[in-house]
């Protein structure tokens, strides 16, 4: 699944992606962020900043410099991981722009993500966005699409004037996303992928990775990848590997062992879905449970 082409960029410098969209990449590369967080600036007069990124003074300065004399009127967040939302507040202090995001207060009570970049549990938006809402600026319109799975509060945003989807971490341009229970939900993730197949967006711009020019092809590949993974899990259980750590050693044998803890959480997400759909049964809870075929 990691067959994406590299793309050229320079930290601190913006790239004009389309007439209405510029991208800046924060200098926070890593195993879950690829080259770093891509911040998108939408519009020509009134600007929307999508996913400001992590706390980073240099990145904040680059956003302000890229906006020039134009007003930043909206700050928009796809979801509240620490590589996406924390810079919203410092940016708001400078610009006065309201912060827009889906908000689920209960999410903060069920997050347990020691992987990826962690949760921004202090985040509260000024404007709560719901599925189907339209956010409008001078020369742009963003449609909000609720896409839970990676997180329960994940939103994608469609730029209607250019048929572009800002896909956040739901569909990334370098790898499949990580699903970490309890807030991450594999069943919801697959439903959200299928939801995107009902749309006609021409291009996806993910927060991590390169532009996606054939989005439906990639979404179908991601769905196929997850279904194949569940078949691998079934075969592992049939071979006598009843615990998650045993399954991971077999299924992810070609992956750096240092990433096996994250792979264990992804496997747990698959198992939760398979239990829910009466494919397998579970005895116990979490990573120490035993699983068997029904």
Label the predicted regions.
Residues 78-84, 150, 208, 270:
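Histidine-centered divalent metal-coordination motifs
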Residues 47-49, 54-56, 116-124, 134, ...:
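Metallo-beta-lactamase
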Residues 7, 11-70, 156-168, 173:
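Conserved beta-strand hairpin/beta-sheet module of binuclear metal-dependent hydrolase folds
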Residues 35, 54-139, 163:
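Active-site HxH/HxHxD metal-binding segment of metal-dependent hydrolases
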Residues 20, 63, 208, 233, ...:
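Residue-level signal for inorganic ion chemistry
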Residues 25-27, 103, 148, 208:
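Residues at the C-termini of beta-strands that transition into short coil/loop
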Residues 2-3, 235-294:
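C-terminal regulatory/interaction regions
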